[in-house]
Amino acid sequence: MLKFIFKRLLEALPTLFILITFSFFLMRLAPGSPFTSERAYPPEVMANIEAKYHLNEPLYKQYFLYLENLSKGDFGPSFKYKDQSVNDLIASAFPVSIKLGMVAFAFAVVLGVTAGTLAALNQNSRWDYILMSFSMLGVIMPSFVFAPVLVLIFAIYLGWLPAGGWNGGTAMYMILPVASLTIAYVAGIARIMRGSMIEVLHSNFIRTAKAKGLSMSRIILKHALRPALLPVITYLGPAFVGIITGSMVIESVFGLPGMGLLFVNGALNRDYSLVLSLTILVGTLTILFNAIVDILYAIIDPKIRY
């Protein structure tokens, strides 16, 4: 098992290197400059600014310099936020995004697995139709559409919840962003779990367990749940990617001081260092989580270890 884990993590390194390389050159080759504005700088001032940030160097030298700094954990200075490094900006924004993403992910898994299991146990019943109808609604409605609807109902009309802000990540301020992020993935997980659980419940070993007189709760928890989770675990990798990238949109909608707001401001102001660093960070989390999903799959189903 340790050999499989080491191999899977090792395979992620080339992907990370390609991500860093492509992101760097795409950002540098984009038209415009971080210092392009309506106010034109004198040529001497522009030359000094570019020399300060090594933008006057050939592109390949900038690339190797960036790799050297990156190997030391230095993301470089921000071009927009004066006298602040990208490391400091990410350090203040990352806890907001990761807390929002992890809470949304946990709720999506728990609610999705529970709803899918209940629908499978009550196949073709009223509860099954209700749960699957709600899941279909969650699939077809993207989070950036669902979020304003929630704000309109619960913040403006009813006044139960704040329409935006963070306030240290208290529960009241997280309910609407988490709900906006979670709904689509609860729906996706529920539909996958329902189909998988129905298939498992019609297996021969489940019939044997029923013939032995085991209770349905014991059959589900001890025999059916583990094999039924395999397709769900496969879906968790893309779901995590969707939640992390979706949180950037949701943060902009609710005005949360996370990586999403930084990314939008950085992109609008051509802040190369900031946008590149956030892209690499999100990409690294994505690659790492996909590797973790593969490892979890191997733990549950040892047949895939190779």
From Swiss-Prot:
Q: In terms of one coarse class, where is the protein primarily found?
A: membrane
What residues form the membrane-spanning segments?
Answer: 9-29, 100-120, 136-156, 170-190, 230-250, 280-300
Q: Which InterPro entries match?
A: BPD_transp_1_N, MetI-like, MetI-like_sf
Which Gene Ontology molecular-function terms are recorded? peptidoglycan peptide transmembrane transporter activity
One GO cellular component assignment for this chain's record is:
plasma membrane
Q: Where in the cell is it found?
A: Cell inner membrane
Q: Which GO terms describe its biological process?
A: protein transport
Q: How does it assemble?
A: The complex is composed of two ATP-binding proteins (OppD and OppF), two transmembrane proteins (OppB and OppC) and a solute-binding protein (OppA).
Its family remark reads:
Belongs to the binding-protein-dependent transport system permease family. OppBC subfamily.
Q: What is this protein called?
A: Oligopeptide transport system permease protein OppB
Q: What is the lineage of its organism?
A: Bacteria, Pseudomonadati, Pseudomonadota, Gammaproteobacteria, Pasteurellales
